[in-house]
Amino acid sequence: MVINTTDPEERVINLSFVLGFIKEIFGLIWIRIYILIPILGVLIGLLVIVWLERKISAGIQQRIGPEYAGPLGILQALADGIKLLLKEDIIPSRGDLWLFSIGPAIVVIPILSSYLVIPFGRHIVLADLSIGVFFRIAVSSIAPLGLLMAGYGSNNKYSFSGGLRAAAQSISYEIPLALCVLSISLLSNSLGTVDIVEAQSRYGFWGWNLWRQPIGFIAFFISSLAECERLPFDLPEAEEELVAGYQTEYSGIKFGLFYVASYLNLLASSLFVTILYLGGWNFSIPSIPISEYFEWDSINGTSEVLGITMGILITLAKAYLFLFISITARWTLPRMRIDQLLDLGWKFLLPIALGNLLLTASFQLLLL
């Protein structure tokens, strides 16, 4: 019996049927594997980001950084996570228990949901939605509601001020983000993440939206940093002004959820910058025809595995470049005031993103 399908999942299921397994049971197992692998990948990526930030920050400040927990301190993030799990979970006596407890979950769940539409290859995406990029913007706008609930439920003036700042900051920078995504969608004729990457691959390296939309890239880059609440945009948790902002009353696992959500959001934003502006999983470097050797081949299994691996590595390499820039900006730029942050969003980024959208639409109409 010869099995030859274009779908790797079908090939494995059919092989299991030949070996005597029940096809339905193996299908359920395969679904669980599909869910488990992305979760493990995200957790490993989270640990790597925390370690990289500590090492890069230490290098900028001429320190050694973590070095005792594992080789080169690679297990330091894991040790910190275990410490948070073992800490006591303290709840304010005069706070709102329901809002205080559900706030961290509302922050984490939408950020995790955005990973559903992130492609690491032509066939490596959990949900290839036709509105993938807008799905990311929609779910990311839910997170500030959790921050506002956490700040209000803490019954603390610093926490409440941090929650209000998070809501104001999100509203200010979600609109420029959406306008930049609309410009990309006009160029690609699609809102799907896979289609946007495929549209960039038609013209190679110079087809990246980074070159076709330089103004939009700058606006998207700044808005992404503000959405992640990274310095110089970490006003909701400014230590010198608000102690720790909406995190002031939190400890233990609930504080750990905010910590995880911050880095997950940074990783998701880096991956979306890669998908929208840097060609996604395509190598696309002139004079290096790497794509010819790693095509999606349904017959040659080795070539298929290498192609998948190369796509994942290329996507992560581009994303970690954005991460490096974000971490470096944390230690090189001073924090803005809240009025300066809102002015930047409403008076600078919004007009630029809107003008970029109008220019893109005009050029697309001329090309019809």
From Swiss-Prot:
InterPro entries: NADH_UbQ_OxRdtase_su1/FPO, NADH_UbQ_OxRdtase_su1_CS. Its EC number is 7.1.1.-. It is an enzyme of class 7 (translocase). It catalyses: a plastoquinone + NADH + (n+1) H(+)(in) = a plastoquinol + NAD(+) + n H(+)(out); a plastoquinone + NADPH + (n+1) H(+)(in) = a plastoquinol + NADP(+) + n H(+)(out). It comes from the Eukaryota. Keywords: Chloroplast, Membrane, NAD, NADP, Plastid, Plastoquinone, Quinone, Thylakoid, Translocase, Transmembrane, Transmembrane helix. One of its GO terms (biological process) is aerobic respiration. It is found in: Plastid, Chloroplast thylakoid membrane. It is a multi-pass membrane protein. It holds the Pfam family NADHdh. The chain crosses the membrane at residues 11-31, 33-53, 98-118, 131-151, 177-197, 205-225, 255-275, 305-325, 348-368. GO terms for molecular function: NADH dehydrogenase activity; oxidoreductase activity, acting on NAD(P)H, quinone or similar compound as acceptor; quinone binding. Its main location: plastid. The keyword NAD applies. NDH is composed of at least 16 different subunits, 5 of which are encoded in the nucleus. NDH shuttles electrons from NAD(P)H:plastoquinone, via FMN and iron-sulfur (Fe-S) centers, to quinones in the photosynthetic chain and possibly in a chloroplast respiratory chain. The immediate electron acceptor for the enzyme in this species is believed to be plastoquinone. Couples the redox reaction to proton translocation, and thus conserves the redox energy in a proton gradient. HAMAP family: NDH1_NuoH. NCBIfam families: PRK06076.1-2. Belongs to the complex I subunit 1 family. This is NAD(P)H-quinone oxidoreductase subunit 1, chloroplastic. It comes from Cycas taitungensis.
